[in-house]
A protein has these predicted regions:
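Structural/interface elements that position substrates and couple domains in central-metabolism enzymes
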Residues: 1-437
Length: 437
């Protein structure tokens, strides 16, 4: 089977590489010539555990190829996946220009039946627009070539994307013809053989499923942060509350961790897009709006705690940050809580010493040299008046606190992910604050 993946960002590159791993011949397409040249040389543009080795293995095996020309692929492929970006527009809606450009290119150049599958996260109704764009280009050519559209949303977690793709909880596929269903069944057969669920449905339902999943996950995060903030006010311990409610089989423990807010390429963007989709259809998503509001407030909570510790006087203070990426296992800083915190610290006259195991280069690209980039987590703590944990990387979980205390100017720790034993740190002489207790 031959397929093309348009877009070599996070979703496209992982998707193409994992399909190649199952024996499919995959061509990854991107208009960015520098990115394609780097990929052809084995230089991977994103940090994702296991991806580089898998790319190199499949390139060597002759199953994975890279090009800037979608037109050159269309004679040979059975399926084209569109995995291009859908950035938020000024009004919060998803910008579909790249998705529709791909559709137009396919319509202008296809010579045989092609199944066009949208992998990007897109609003309900996008498949209809893709179909119309392809049909319009075919009409311009005076051609009546058969084609199908489908929706196959991704459910990958950054930092665990390879395992998520190769061992999925489920695969959601929206189709509108038996021919398209047979092709997608054939493509996903290696996964079906080991009893993974492939759920076929209509296309609008598949498009909505992705948004609904992210809505639910974002809601659980904001719900727990809301509860955590109230716990602090009434003297309850959010960790105990989490254990109490998470033990209920109807609720479960996943995505019930309080912290300093969610970020990344999906939740913030998709929440805004779903709110906008509802507005365009005359409906107001009241719960989802609250989810967004809670999260925006939560990103500032560590700064508020720091202000209280120093009685409002932060000017000249040195603050160490552990973690810059929006979550462990990635270098992605899109909508990261650390960005909000750094901006507030700099505005208050603080000196910032930051360390992240993967996101240092990305941070330099985003905010330049406005902070000191430490060599390791201990260097970050040197002469610091306060240490703030923002991202719960594994290497931050068991630091040598005696060394940290000696390095710091003042032993103040703000735990933005509730991973430390506050009683232990307080016994050692630290001032310790966390979320929700």
């Amino acid at each position: 089977m031959n397929i093309a993946i348009v877009g070599t960002g996070y979703v496209g590159l992982v998707t193409g590489t994992c399909f190649a791993e199952t024996g499919v011949d995959v061509t990854c397409v991107d208009v960015n010539a520098d990115k394609i040249a780097n990929l052809q040389q084995g230089i991977i543009p994103i940090y994702e555990p296991g991806l580089e080795d898998m790319v190199l293995r499949n390139v060597k095996a002759g199953r994975l190829h890279f090009t800037t020309s979608l037109e050159s692929c269309l004679d040979n492929v059975d399926i084209v996946f569109s995995a291009v970006g859908t950035p938020p527009d000024e009004d919060g809606s998803a910008d579909l220009r790249y998705v529709l450009e791909v559709a137009k290119t396919i319509g202008a150049n296809m010579k045989k039946y092609t199944l066009v599958v949208t992998k990007s996260t897109v609003p309900v109704g996008t498949a209809r627009k893709v179909k119309a764009a392809i049909r319009e280009e075919l009409e311009k050519r005076g051609e009546s070539i058969d084609f199908d559209v489908a929706s196959n949303p991704e459910f990958l977690k950054e930092g665990n994307a390879i395992d998520d793709f190769m061992s999925p909880d489920r695969v959601v596929v929206g189709v509108e013809s038996e021919r398209a269903k047979k092709l997608m069944t054939k493509l996903y057969k290696p996964f079906m053989l080991v009893n993974f669920r492939v759920i076929f449905m209509d296309i609008p339902s598949a498009e909505m499923t992705k948004y609904a999943a992210n809505y639910m996950l974002a809601t659980r995060i904001s719900f727990m942060n809301d509860i955590a903030n109230l716990c602090e006010l009434v003297g309850a311990d959010v960790n105990m509350v989490r254990d109490g409610i998470g033990s209920d089989s109807r609720i479960g423990r996943k995505f019930l961790y309080p912290g300093c807010g969610y970020g990344g390429s999906c939740f913030p963007k998709d929440v805004k897009a779903l709110i906008k989709t509802a507005e365009q259809n005359g409906y107001s998503m009241q719960v989802l709006k609250a989810v967004e509001d809670v999260n925006e407030n939560q990103k500032g909570i560590l700064f508020e705690k720091l202000v209280k510790v120093f009685n409002g006087d932060l000017k000249g203070k040195t603050v160490a940050l552990w973690g810059l990426a929006f979550k462990p296992g990635t270098d992605d800083m899109r909508e990261a809580p650390a960005l909000v915190l750094i901006e507030k610290l700099k505005q208050s006259g603080c000196n910032v010493r930051a360390y992240d195991p993967a996101a240092m280069d990305e941070s330099r690209r985003r905010i330049g040299e406005s902070v000191y980039y430490a060599h390791d987590m201990y260097d970050a703590a040197l002469d610091a008046d306060a240490l703030i944990l923002v991202t719960e990387w594994k290497e931050f979980r068991l630091p040598t606190w005696g060394v940290i205390k000696k390095a710091m100017k003042q032993p103040v720790v703000l735990d933005g992910r509730n991973i430390y034993d506050g009683d232990e740190l307080q016994e050692m002489g630290f001032v310790y604050h966390c979320i929700g207790r």
